[in-house]
Regions:
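Membrane-interfacial helix-loop segments of redox and metal-homeostasis proteins
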Residues: 1-138
Length: 138
């Protein structure tokens, strides 16, 4: 079943805010929260993430009917990519390699911002590229 495109974009906006605060404060705890949010989105789809729940319960009822839908697989893959970057960032911050924490968190922030501000999902594009490459290889 396809999903409302506004949900992942809302999640990207919240993620952008959270990751910006992580970079400003260097908070490993807040990055751990974001890592968990990515993990839930990767495991169960964006609707199962905390931000998906917020969108579904607080935001979507106040919006009009969705006019655009997308397959859930690309955003789910994007959550897994975000999980990888957040996990590396979390390792960096907790092991004292702050440069690694900042670099990985900054990369995740850039991707989230692109989705939130412009509707361009880097992880989704990666998913489509991987699909094209694997279909050709078969």
């Amino acid at each position: 079943m396809d999903i409302d495109v506004r949900g992942p974009r809302f999640g990207a906006a919240v993620t952008t805010l959270v990751l910006a605060v992580v970079l400003i404060t260097g908070s490993a705890w807040l990055l751990a929260w974001q890592t968990l949010a990515f993990a839930l989105g990767a495991a169960g789809g964006v609707g199962r993430s905390p931000y998906g729940w917020l969108f579904r319960t607080l935001v979507r009822p106040r919006l009009g009917r969705p006019t655009e839908f997308e397959s859930p697989e690309p955003p789910r893959f994007a959550q897994a990519v975000g999980l990888a970057f957040a996990g590396v960032g979390l390792l960096g911050f907790t092991l004292g390699a702050d440069w690694l924490g900042v670099a990985a968190t900054g990369a995740a922030l850039a991707a989230a911002f692109l989705n939130a501000a412009f509707g361009y999902c880097l992880g989704c594009e990666m998913y489509l590229l991987v699909r094209r490459l694997t279909v050709r290889a078969e």
